[in-house]
Amino acid sequence: MILFIPYLICLVGTSSALKVMTFNIWLSGAEVTNGMEKIAKQIQNVNPDVVALQEVESPDVVTNLTLLLGDNWSGVHHCNSTYPDTGILTKHTIIPGTYVHVDYGMHVKIQLLDTKRQISFWSMHLDYRSYGPYACYNKLVNSEKQIMAGEMPTTCTGRVQNMVQLVTNQNFINQISKSNVVPVIVAGDFNVPSDEDWTEANRAEHGGWAFEWPATKILRDSSGMKDSFRELHPDPLADPGITWSTVNKFEKEWDYTIPEPEDRIDFIFYRGPLRPTSSFPYAGTGPLTPIPHQWGNEWPSDHYAFITEFQDLPVSDDPVDPVKSVDRKYINRHGRDALRVATPQCNAEIIDGSEERQGRSLSLSGEGQHGSEVK
Ligand SMILES: *[C@@H]1O[C@H](CO)[C@@H](O)[C@H](O)[C@H]1NC(C)=O
Ligand SMILES: *[C@@H]1O[C@H](CO)[C@@H](O)[C@H](O)[C@H]1NC(C)=O
Ligand SMILES: *[C@@H]1O[C@H](CO)[C@@H](O)[C@H](O)[C@H]1NC(C)=O
């Protein structure tokens, strides 16, 4: 019996903290002066372990950020080189051959230095069009069907289809089934509020609507993921956690007289044996001067970033509930099309600042192509 005690202490000793940041970098810093430097500086101030990026405008954005962040940082972006949009930065080790993408996001597995732990990490940026809160504040909108038409359009892919594509992705399903050993984190800009936020209690603050926004609901119901912020702060009235917007306070048309609705649209979801200990929106420490006078702001984005700190607990042997099928009401004709992952296969590179200085970058093997993740 006594012999077991040092072993237990040893197990406890392997647990460590994990700080995750999701950061929409607003056209890659183009809307403030020296935007790229400011993005890097804000990441350094937060000092996260992993960052989910959105609005990576071109492939050299991740290269430049890793160069600015310093030696131990590396990154990957979505392999769509026309507009990568999503990317991941970390000061730990990106595991080659683990890149996977969907149309609106991408994933790599990360080995946490100084531990035996790995995480499966997704950065997502769902479609920005037909922004739901605008419908809710439009007095000509009087049925939920009209709002849902924006989330789940029949003529193109919307946020419902984007999320259904993620939760039905075979790699994602495999990751969830192993999340008791390798936690899964889905972070990003969903461009839509949470189904846990627009409740009866705060109807008055939401244009008179309580509404079950579907993207977060699909993620929670189907994959059993939890929203780290809402878990720690369950009352949306007391803790709205607004992330939109830092500087977009009034619409440019009508001479900035019409206010922009404020919402929490950036999220850090997780599944696995780790426990969030703090979670908060973040926009630096300086003043946030609204559009159109934002150019001198130290904070380079029109979103707040979101940060969640996890306590990384020992591996669990508990069985994992598998991913459940998506509620049929979220599948329309265009949704079925989205289930067949449309994006062609492509290669992604791990971009390492120190290697890049010498004019080359580490290439992922063919295993990194879509649909062939090592299980
Ligand atoms: C990245 O850095 C290179 C070299 O300084 C520069 O030419 C390029 O414009 C930068 N790209 C972005 C997106 O800032
Ligand atoms: C970078 O990583 C090396 C090797 O893991 C470590 O010795 C060093 O302290 C790290 N540097 C920084 C700035 O974190
Ligand atoms: C890459 O992204 C652009 C812009 O979103 C899109 O139009 C294009 O279809 C994408 N390319 C591929 C190969 O998916």
Indicate where each model-derived feature is located.
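Acidic helix-start/capping segments at beta-turn-to-alpha-helix junctions
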Residues: 56-61, 84, 190-193
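A short, structured active-site edge motif that brings together acidic residues
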Residues: 73-87
